[in-house]
Amino acid sequence: MEAGFAAAEGIHRVDAEAEVLVRPLADGGEGTVEALVAGMNGKTEHVKVTGPLGEPVICEYGIIESTKTAVIEMAGAAGITQVPDEKRNPLYTTTYGVGEVIKDAIEKGCRRFIVGIGGSATNDGGVGMLQALGYAFLDKDGKQVLPGARGLKDITEITDAYVIPELAE
């Protein structure tokens, strides 16, 4: 919105009578929640989730009540800015917190989801997110694979025995 207001100000310097409408815009990374909540008359929520390195983080997301839609940024729960430079290794980062945000939104009545994937620190293919929702990713011995991208090569089975019931709706 900031860039839009700056552009509007510049246009008005040239033509004070020009009608300029500033609308939210985002690329799927940081700022997506803010833009869509503002543009769709939503509200913001905050939830404590598992960050990309397993530490707790507070993630902001949006809810558009009229459509029961949650607006989530991966960057808020699994963002690159949450990982210090010396620990930036996608083999060890997880999207688990994104699944926790989705679960929180489901508990608040959301059934549709917009997930912006920009700004992510992860490359686990969404496995962590699905684990948070109750899916199990098993290796050839029936054991849970390692978290993050490290375990991807070992997945031989996916089970849904513990998936939250709302996902069947």
Where are these regions (language model features)?
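Anion-binding (especially nucleotide phosphate/pyrophosphate-binding) glycine-rich loop
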Residues: P56-A121
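Gly/Ser/Thr-rich loops at beta-strand to alpha-helix junctions
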Residues: M1, A26-G29, I117-D124
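Short acidic, glycine/serine/threonine-rich loops at helix termini
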Residues: V33-E34, P84, G125-L130
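Short amphipathic alpha-helical surface micro-motifs
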Residues: E2-F5, P52-E55, Y135, D154-E157
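A general alpha-helical scaffold signature found inside nucleotide-binding enzyme cores
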Residues: E2, A6, T93-Y96
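Glycine/threonine-rich beta-strand-loop-alpha-helix active-site module
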Residues: Y92-Y96, E100-G116, A121-A168
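Glycine-rich nucleotide/cofactor/substrate-binding loop typically near the N-terminus or early
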Residues: F5-Q82, A149, L167-E169
